């Protein structure tokens, strides 16, 4: 029999998939608590009206370890634009002080190549033009990004990257994204 009204016959995501997306947002250290709540609300909107009531852990967003850097999403957009345009960028690289706030550490001028999600952190893989070295810097420590007019140094011109980026090596040989060569140590 036909009932009057309308209904959605197909959904883009199943509820289990939406729960996985929500868990990813919750566990993401690089998304602020406020942004996490907003994203989770929008993800819940992709299902029916009963889905939100089945998600109990939404209200625990503030209990998770989250960044305070609200500029992260702007940083991601800006860096992607610079990578697409193949231009250098300048930014302030910061470190957390004992007051748990970011403090400017240095100004960087880099050729950006890739953003890498590793150990629940976003890193910028870039060639530091002043140090003449590849760097991996946490996106939540970057502020005040500015585009330059200079073209990015092609990655194939950098020693060790003539064949491009080896993601397998990066993820296994550099667990904390330090670029120094690995050294063997002996415990006695």
What are these regions (language model features)?
Residues 47, 83, 119, 143-149:
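Short, well-ordered alpha-helical segments in soluble proteins
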Residues 125-188:
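Surface-exposed, charged, gly/pro-rich loop-and-adjacent secondary-structure segments at domain edges
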Residues 80-135:
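Loop-centered beta-sheet repeat module
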Residues 7-97:
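Bulky hydrophobic/aromatic content
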